Design a protein with these regions (language model features):
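Hydrophobic transmembrane helix segments
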Residues: 26-34
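Alpha-helical transmembrane segments of multi-pass inner-membrane proteins
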Residues: 2-25, 56-71, 86-104, 121-130, ...
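Non-cytosolic membrane-interface motifs at loop->transmembrane helix junctions
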Residues: 107-118
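Membrane-interfacial, low-structure loops and terminal tails that flank and connect transmembrane helices
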Residues: 1-4, 74-80
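Perimembrane loop-to-helix junctions flanking transmembrane segments
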Residues: 33-48
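Interfacial helix-start motif at the membrane-water boundary
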Residues: 44-60
């Protein structure tokens, strides 16, 4: 029992990263430096979807590092893998590009509405290193995936409401959640997130391309989980989640998401094509679901 708890505690920070960070939406007014302001419409940026995601992400990366340090100190085992080489090369390129950048602060912290500077990019690399070493058992993988899917379902439900013109962030409750009391009085009435004339899904990411990329990954992941699920209840559960991710993927109208699914599908067919074809009944059922979802959204 103690060993199980210890396994879960090691990967809890990873579970929090994949579940909490994507769902964060909060208003922040950011004063821009002179260099960035010349490329922006104002000398400040009103951010809802990126700044606090960055802060929570970096905070949880620190927590994951502590977990990783404790694990290495106790287990005295660092997994050996070739993946460290490309990760190291990428890390070197990030550091060099920041050093030689003319806009150092932008390189470090990122650009308005996309705060993915050097610190965050290094955080992405560290996530891979931590995951390689900390995720050692099926229990741990299931634990992290459970957190991810719960978050993805919640984000997916928000997306469906957006598609049908019922954006949660346009309701009073939604606005109060993403605005402080002071800012609610100032900007709540004029707050609006729209993309053209269509109810395009942006979920909790603002940019539909980011949403499309997120749902593309979750769509392909849950598609595989659906096929290899054991038991009718698990099959139905993962099938329903897969259809929800599919609906949001379509509703985001993201070219990046489309390319992601196409590329992933080729890899999936290459690796698991025979197993999927053998399970043709499950394939037929989910494809009927895709058709129904597509028809409902047309």
């Amino acid at each position: 029992m103690k060993s199980k708890i210890k396994e879960y505690l090691y990967v809890l920070p990873l579970a929090l990263i994949v579940s909490i960070v994507p769902i964060i939406v909060r208003y922040k007014k950011i004063e821009l430096g002179e260099v960035i302001a010349t490329y922006w419409t104002r000398n400040y940026n009103t951010d809802f979807f990126s700044y606090y995601k960055m802060l929570f992400f970096l905070g949880l990366i620190l927590l994951t590092f502590i977990s990783f340090y404790i694990y290495i100190k106790k287990e005295k085992e660092l997994k050996k893998t070739f993946y460290y080489i490309p990760l190291g090369i990428y890390l070197l390129m990030i550091v060099l590009s920041t050093i030689f950048s003319e806009a150092k602060l932008t390189s470090l912290y990122g650009f308005p509405d996309r705060y993915e500077g050097m610190a965050v990019l290094i955080g992405y690399i560290l996530i891979v290193v931590f995951a390689i070493n900390l995720l050692r058992s099926k229990r741990q993988i299931k634990f992290v995936l459970t957190f991810l899917l719960i978050s993805a379902v919640l984000i997916g439900v928000l997306g469906i409401y957006q598609f049908y013109g019922m954006d949660f962030f346009q309701t009073e409750i939604g606005k109060r959640l993403i605005l402080s009391a002071e800012n609610f009085e100032k900007i709540a009435e004029k707050l609006e997130f729209r993309f053209g004339d269509n109810n395009i899904i942006y979920a909790t990411f603002y940019n539909p391309n980011y949403a499309g990329s997120f749902f593309a990954m979750l769509f392909m992941l849950t598609f595989v989980m659906y096929f290899f699920a054991e038991g009718r209840q698990n099959k139905l559960l993962f099938g329903a989640i897969n259809l929800l991710m599919f609906a949001n993927w379509l509703g985001s109208l993201s070219r990046a998401g489309i390319l992601g699914v196409l590329f992933s599908s080729f890899i999936l067919l290459f690796l698991l094509g025979r197993k999927i074809i053998k399970n043709w009944k499950s394939l037929l059922i989910i494809f009927i679901g895709f058709i129904l979802v597509f028809t409902a959204g047309s």
